[in-house]
């Protein structure tokens, strides 16, 4: 069941080295549309996180996309072993050989992805947001100032979460992503920064 609430928020980040958990809006803020995210291969749904175990919409998505394995991870200082090391590794810019699929069941955090000009776009994921980052997409994750997220991780087949830290421009999966999503002649959405 689609949940009615404000849509996913995303914006271009400033270059500040301040706490990674801050929003890092540019001044003035420069928001990014869902269409721009889709042009980068980022897919998004808003689902009923309170009823995720019986949600028919989630079942349809899982069936259609072949997500046959799930687990739930809680990221917060009290629940995640080696918390500081994990947060640091999540925030290292990296790619995966497969999609990264996360469904926020509670809490919130940020996924950052690169645009075609290598600028960071920050995506604020909140309760009910399900997001898919395509294989080969440079990205990173951090908690926001609430320091808490509970997320369902979804996989096709065996659960594999192997990050390949940047630079990976010669990796075949990265090349495939660039060819599919970042070739200027293939972009049908204006990716220019808008005020």
From Swiss-Prot:
Enzyme class name: oxidoreductase
GO biological process: L-methionine salvage from methylthioadenosine; methionine metabolic process
EC number: 1.13.11.54, 1.13.11.53
Pfam families: ARD (PF03079)
Catalytically driven reaction(s): 1,2-dihydroxy-5-(methylsulfanyl)pent-1-en-3-one + O2 = 4-methylsulfanyl-2-oxobutanoate + formate + 2 H(+); 1,2-dihydroxy-5-(methylsulfanyl)pent-1-en-3-one + O2 = 3-(methylsulfanyl)propanoate + CO + formate + 2 H(+)
Disulfide bond entries: none
Major subcellular location class: cytoplasm
Function per UniProt: Catalyzes 2 different reactions between oxygen and the acireductone 1,2-dihydroxy-3-keto-5-methylthiopentene (DHK-MTPene) depending upon the metal bound in the active site. Fe-containing acireductone dioxygenase (Fe-ARD) produces formate and 2-keto-4-methylthiobutyrate (KMTB), the alpha-ketoacid precursor of methionine in the methionine recycle pathway. Ni-containing acireductone dioxygenase (Ni-ARD) produces methylthiopropionate, carbon monoxide and formate, and does not lie on the methionine recycle pathway.
Family, as annotated: Belongs to the acireductone dioxygenase (ARD) family.
Protein name as annotated: Acireductone dioxygenase 2
Organism: Physcomitrium patens (Spreading-leaved earth moss)
